């Protein structure tokens, strides 16, 4: 309600819209299908549904989420604001800091020539986020700008893989939240979109 009121009371805002979409839409924690997962029990312990409406299936809840998300985005646009949509950040299924520490602790020789890079399947990312991409991509408006975090981490330094670190930086704070270094990369992309908006406004 506070956010809605703020958007009503102010004009020509640039709104950055991002959240972890996958877990709410799929109701499962992340499994990288290579031996690492977010939780031992992958089933999400709660789900989203409209107030005073009891849903009976995941498909029904997904439809409500889709309708609600599209409605909220259109509401922001129709109030005259510009919107930067930030798509799903790749999930890793483990804490890369702990992973690298354990690697170093048990086998320091691995670090003699280079730093091991932890990565996950880009295909797994695409499959898991297919629905949210379809929903966000279906909303077309010249006032919408888009940022794709996966283009920073996936299919870049390693083909068909999403990386959690490189030789110099660890991009994740834990299994799915970006570190300061990782966040800076995404924020730089957001700022590029904001600059485009400001150039058009002048």
Give the positions of each predicted feature.
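Extracellular glycan-modifying ectodomains
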Residues: 1-202
